[in-house]
Amino acid sequence: MSSRREGRELALQALYSSDVEVMDGTTVLKRIMENFGDGSEPAVDAHSRSFSFAAELVNGVVANRAAIDQRIEEKSKNWSISRMARVDLNILRLAVFELFYRPDIPKNVTINEAIEVAKKFGADDSPAFINGILDEIASLLPDKE
C-alpha cells in the first residue's frame, strides 16, 4: 500500500473517531497510530510519510471544514450532510480538501483514491455515491497536470 493511501486511511479513521468522540482530529490520529497493530509497538511511526500526510489531511479538513461541507452540500443532490453516513462524509471531506487545497495531486487521483478507500471502509453503495458527488465537485476545477 502506498504511503499516501495509508495516510488517507489513517486520516479517515481519525476524522470518523473525532466525530464520534468529539475530540481533536490530531489527538485522535496520534491515538490511532499508537493503538493499531499488535500493541507491542506503534503501527505507524510518527515521522513516517503516511502519518505526515494523514496529519496534513486531518488538519486541513479541520481548518477548512465549513467551506468543505458547503461544497459537498451544494453538489449532493437530495442529500443533506446530516443524513450522510459518517464514513462517506469524511471520505468526501478528505477528497474535497485534496481537490481544492492540494493542487499538486491530480483530481483523477484524488477521486480514484476516495473510491478505493470507500470500497474498504464504506457500505456497498458508498463508492458510487462518493464518485457521483466528487465528479460534480471536480467539474468546477480546471484539470491538474
From Swiss-Prot:
GO molecular function, one term: RNA binding
UniProt entry tagged with the keyword rRNA processing: no
Record's GO cellular component terms: cytosol
Name of a matching Pfam family: NusB
Highest rank taxon of the organism: Bacteria
Keyword terms: RNA-binding, Transcription, Transcription antitermination, Transcription regulation
Coiled coil ranges: none
Signal sequence residues: none
Any GO BP: transcription antitermination
Matching SUPFAM superfamilies: NusB-like
Matching HAMAP family: NusB
Described function: Involved in transcription antitermination. Required for transcription of ribosomal RNA (rRNA) genes. Binds specifically to the boxA antiterminator sequence of the ribosomal RNA (rrn) operons.
NCBIfam families: nusB
Family of the protein in this entry: Belongs to the NusB family.
Name of the protein this chain belongs to: Transcription antitermination protein NusB
Organism this protein belongs to: Geotalea uraniireducens (strain Rf4) (Geobacter uraniireducens)
